[in-house]
Curated annotation (Swiss-Prot):
Organism whose genome encodes this protein: Sphingopyxis alaskensis (strain DSM 13593 / LMG 18877 / RB2256)
Region (Disordered): 35-68
Compositionally biased intervals (Basic and acidic residues): 37-49
Superkingdom field: Bacteria
BP-aspect Gene Ontology terms: translation
Family that this chain belongs to: Belongs to the bacterial ribosomal protein bS21 family.
Keyword Ribosomal protein applies: yes
Listed GO MF terms: structural constituent of ribosome
Keyword Plastid annotated: no
Pfam families: Ribosomal_S21 (PF01165)
Protein name in UniProt: Small ribosomal subunit protein bS21
Biased composition (Basic residues): 50-59
Name of the coding gene: rpsU
PROSITE patterns: RIBOSOMAL_S21
Record keywords: Ribonucleoprotein, Ribosomal protein
Length: 68
């Protein structure tokens, strides 16, 4: 990953770097890898995330279609 420092403005470059890392999910990955996660716990976490995504998509679909 490369960030260009323009006009010796390191603060702006750091903000850009943090934004890029956030967008690519590096912080989330670091948090997950901080401790070992058992395969069963990983499956449960991923299953819960899938349920949350499905519910969110259903809510958005219902909102878009005008159903409440």
């Amino acid at each position: 990953m490369q960030i260009i420092v323009r006009d010796n403005n390191v603060d702006q470059a750091l903000r850009a770097l943090k934004k890029k890392l956030q967008r690519e999910g590096v912080y989330r990955e670091m948090k997950l890898r901080r401790h070992y996660e058992k395969p069963s716990e990983k499956r449960a976490r991923e299953r819960a995330a899938a349920v949350r995504r499905a519910r969110k998509m259903e809510r958005k679909r219902m909102e878009r279609d005008g159903i409440k």
